[in-house]
A protein has these predicted regions:
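Short, small-residue-biased leader/transition segments that mark boundaries at the very start
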Residues: 3-4, 175
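Extended glycan-interaction surfaces of carbohydrate-active proteins
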Residues: 5, 10-55, 88-93
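Non-catalytic C-terminal accessory modules of carbohydrate-active enzymes
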Residues: 14, 28-38, 58-173
Length: 175
């Protein structure tokens, strides 16, 4: 069920609070990336990619987990979202021979990258709310259907400087 995507605060309460949820999310990235073959009888590509990514049990090639990195935003740990988002983009999206995940269900993997590179992500599609990530570009502008522009500025952005100090929308601080 995708109910937890619509109610991350409720998920946090069910897990015992923000600290407990943070520990569970952290463990996904630090647990050994061990696996069993299950009914397949062989290593499927999602498992091979999880092992190659070397981020614990986080299997980016398995689309239902891709939003999980952004759940840190909902518990007041946006720097962990920013760290892991950039790490996935650096390791899995590049021009080398292994620069793209082997699984692309309905454009989800590409959409994850496009949104993440812009610096925000729709944790629950269909809900007009976005979690903050780590933009790749120093500046980008989206031209909206109503003729307005939405501009993301990440001044000083670099591989080493990937963390957001503050985010403004209509002059209101959001981080």
């Amino acid at each position: 069920s995708d109910v937890y995507k619509r109610q991350p605060e409720g998920l946090s309460r069910l897990m015992g609070g923000h600290t407990a949820m943070e520990a569970r999310l952290d463990s996904m990235f630090t647990a050994p990336n061990t696996y069993n073959y299950g009914t397949y009888g062989f290593v499927i590509h999602e498992i091979a990619e999880m092992v190659a990514l070397d981020m614990g049990q986080y299997a980016h090639g398995n689309q239902p987990v891709q939003h999980a990195i952004y759940l840190y935003d909902y518990i007041g740990r946006p720097w962990k979202t920013q760290k892991h988002v950039r790490e996935v983009m650096d390791k899995l999206y590049h021009s080398g021979s292994k620069g793209y995940c082997g699984d692309e269900d309905n454009g989800q993997t590409s959409a994850w990258y496009v949104f993440s590179a812009m610096g925000f992500y729709p944790v629950c599609p269909g809900v007009p709310e976005y979690a903050m990530g780590s933009p790749l570009f120093p500046k980008l502008t989206l031209h909206l259907p109503d003729g307005k522009n939405f501009t993301v500025k990440a001044e000083g952005n670099s591989p080493a400087n990937r963390y957001i100090g503050k985010a403004l929308l209509l002059s209101l601080i959001h981080i």
